[in-house]
Amino acid sequence: MVVLGVVAIALGIGAPLFATLAANNRMSSATNDLVSSLIAARSEALKRQVTVTLCPTPDGAGACVAGGSLGSGWTVFVDRNADGAISADDVVVQQHGALEGDLRDGVTATPVDLMFTAAGTLAIDAPRPDFHIQLCDQRGDADTGADIAAGRWIQISGLGRQQLVRARLDIQSDRNPLGGC
């Protein structure tokens, strides 16, 4: 009877902690995958001296979806004619399927296509050509410990450099054009 009591207490404490750990790992994995693809896209653009595009492609369907969600998958490809669409003469560099779990994304631009020029900069015609991506799950901006938010905010400067923001107060701040999770 005592053993059952100890097991029940251990499960009561351990199960929620395990669920939080699993959710944190899913968020970290998804964020790392997306940032790796952004780095690969910029690197390929610089290396090949041509436009490289990262666009939403649901489950690796092979075609960019205007207004699509990066949460459903994305493709990085050498965009020889810089039209944001995968053509026969374009080279696919990377494909990623849908994000695991109930992760969703938010972006500051439509269409969601991110085009890196031969100089590695973003091909956005705007006074301040920054791009922002936010990854969220059902926990929103909840503090997961040490003031780290459950969600993530990726800032991409006009120069094509990425910065990952994890601090809860920064994600919820006025600096975040997506307004937090």
What is each stretch, according to the model?
Residues 1, 9-39, 43, 47, ...:
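N-terminal helix-rich module
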